[in-house]
């Protein structure tokens, strides 16, 4: 009888332990998914390095800062962080030692992340990520600008109170989920919302604020982030919800293809999200009204195409375009296939008020990553090695003024030289290879 009772007790304890292990495994797996949604690996890794080990340089107006090691290494990472330490860093912007984090860490967006999701993220980073012994790099910001106490003042003035996201009364649950992902974990506004002179985002949500997601006010690492609102020319007004779903999932659709920093978002984050979450994000973005409701829909102008078809490349920049660009982007500014962006108007591209992204991609090229469902990676070669500053300025002005793009020829050789100086280093920077991360799982 005693043996039977003992066996029953041991069996019950074993079952309970198994159930706990399964629950913990499920929590870690959920945290992994949420880390994908937050695209944590993109900033906290460098190309050729280990995922989440930090070291990615981020240029700021006052110097360069480097992302930190967020692996569970107890000496150089966050292995000795309690849950409270972790959530204070992520949602409040306060490190374990009490220092305020640089707002390159989007803690103002993460302030709405729920306790349940924070606990899952903590479980993943403590138990699902390989520890890496790699010391953090000090910033290149000179003293006295490197002092942290002004950041604490900035945080007190501009960071929102930490308050878990709550759907609005009668809000469509799909829209609510999309809003949570876009405004919270996805931190889309960190790049796509303009900032004030004091560097805070002009809006953290769409609550009566048409600045939200209306496009970056200044380049970020040499790229400008596009308007995600419903504007007809420089926004997503011409896109359907299905267009957005395709772009988010694959980084390409019938309108454009991803370039710049958005390629990392597609590769490391969006391609891994569920169909339901991709739909929720797309539906929420399509619910955003235009910032400038007076914008007319882009209309293609074929005058330049007709001239090029006749062999007339006398317009400044036209001969460079024909020699270097037309094979893929065609003489009418469209594109050879859905794998390539067109040279005619597209959000974030040829007709944008700020030409920085276009100059950047001409100089350094870019790669559209292969993703699940669209495995072919397509690379645009860099042309900075064989085009001088004046030639780059000429072809950028030609593209921006042709096919109905409507921009004036304002780019100078000096503008190109300035950006080229920065891109000499930046072109060789990047993020961790996603395959390295997948091999760890």
Curated annotation (Swiss-Prot):
GO cellular component, one term: plasma membrane
UniProt-annotated binding residues for heme c 2: 188, 191-192
Subcellular location: Cell membrane
E.C. number: 1.1.99.3
Cofactor field: FAD
Gene3D superfamilies the record matches: Cytochrome c-like domain
Recorded topology in the membrane: Peripheral membrane protein
InterPro entries with a match to the protein in the record: Cyt_c-like_dom (IPR009056), Cyt_c-like_dom_sf (IPR036909), Cyt_C_IC (IPR008168), Cytochrome_c-type_DH (IPR051459), Membr-bd_ADH_cyt_c (IPR014353)
Signal peptide: 1-19
PTMs per UniProt: Binds 3 heme c groupd covalently per subunit.
Protein keywords: Cell membrane, Electron transport, Heme, Iron, Membrane, Metal-binding, Oxidoreductase, Repeat, Signal, Transport
Binding site for heme c 1: 40, 43-44
Keyword set includes Calcium: no
Annotated positions binding heme c 3: 325, 328-329
Pfam family, any one: Cytochrom_C
Catalytic reactions of this protein: D-gluconate + A = 2-dehydro-D-gluconate + AH2
Domain Cytochrome c, residue spans: 26-129, 173-289, 312-403
Superkingdom of the organism of origin: Bacteria
pH profile: Optimum pH is 5.0.
GO terms assigned for molecular function: electron transfer activity; gluconate 2-dehydrogenase (acceptor) activity; heme binding; iron ion binding
PROSITE patterns, per database record: CYTC
Entry note: thermal dependence: Optimum temperature is 30 degrees Celsius.
Quaternary state and interactors: Heterotrimer.
Function: Part of the heterotrimer that catalyzes the conversion of D-gluconate to 2-dehydro-D-gluconate.
Protein's recorded name: Gluconate 2-dehydrogenase cytochrome c subunit
Lineage: Bacteria, Pseudomonadati, Pseudomonadota, Gammaproteobacteria, Enterobacterales
């Amino acid at each position: 009888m005693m043996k039977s009772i003992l066996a029953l007790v041991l069996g019950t304890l074993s079952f309970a332990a198994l159930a706990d292990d399964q629950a913990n495994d499920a929590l870690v797996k959920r945290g992994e998914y949420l880390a994908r949604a937050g695209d944590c690996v993109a900033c906290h890794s460098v190309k050729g390095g280990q995922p989440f080990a930090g070291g990615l340089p981020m240029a700021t107006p006052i110097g360069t800062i480097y992302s930190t090691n967020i692996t569970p290494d107890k000496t150089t990472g966050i292995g000795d962080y309690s849950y409270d330490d972790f959530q204070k860093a992520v949602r409040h912007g306060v490190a374990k030692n009490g220092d305020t984090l640089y707002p390159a860490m989007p803690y103002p967006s993460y302030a709405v992340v729920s306790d349940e999701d924070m606990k899952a993220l903590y479980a993943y980073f403590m138990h699902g990520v390989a520890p890496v012994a790699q010391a953090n790099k000090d910033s290149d910001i000179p003293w006295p600008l490197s002092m942290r106490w002004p950041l604490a003042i900035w945080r007190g003035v501009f960071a929102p109170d930490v308050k878990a996201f709550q759907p609005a009364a009668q809000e469509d649950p799909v829209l609510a989920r999309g809003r949570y992902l876009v405004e919270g974990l996805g931190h889309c506004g960190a790049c796509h919302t303009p900032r004030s002179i004091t560097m805070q985002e002009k809006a953290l949500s769409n609550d009566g604020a048409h600045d939200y997601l209306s496009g970056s006010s200044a380049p970020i690492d040499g790229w400008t982030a596009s308007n995600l609102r419903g504007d007809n020319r420089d926004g997503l007004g011409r896109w359907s919800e299905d267009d957005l779903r395709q772009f988010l999932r694959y980084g390409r659709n019938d309108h454009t293809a991803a370039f710049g920093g958005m390629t990392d978002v597609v590769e490391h984050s969006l391609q891994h999200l569920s169909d339901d979450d991709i739909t929720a994000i797309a539906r929420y973005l399509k619910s955003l009204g235009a910032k400038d409701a007076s914008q007319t829909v882009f209309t293609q102008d074929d005058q330049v195409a007709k001239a090029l078809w006749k062999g007339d490349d006398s317009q400044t920049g036209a001969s460079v375009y024909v020699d270097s660009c037309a094979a893929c982007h065609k003489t009418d500014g469209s594109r050879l296939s859905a794998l390539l962006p067109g040279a005619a108007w597209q959000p974030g591209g040829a007709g944008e008020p700020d030409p920085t992204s276009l100059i950047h991609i001409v100089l350094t090229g870019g790669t559209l990553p292969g993703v699940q469902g669209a495995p072919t990676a397509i690379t645009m070669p860099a042309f900075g090695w064989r085009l001088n500053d004046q030639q780059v300025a000429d072809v950028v002005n030609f593209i921006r003024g042709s096919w109905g793009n409507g921009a004036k020829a304002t780019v100078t050789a000096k503008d190109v030289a300035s950006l080229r100086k920065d891109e000499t280093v930046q072109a060789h920077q990047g993020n961790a290879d996603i395959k390295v991360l997948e091999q760890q799982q």
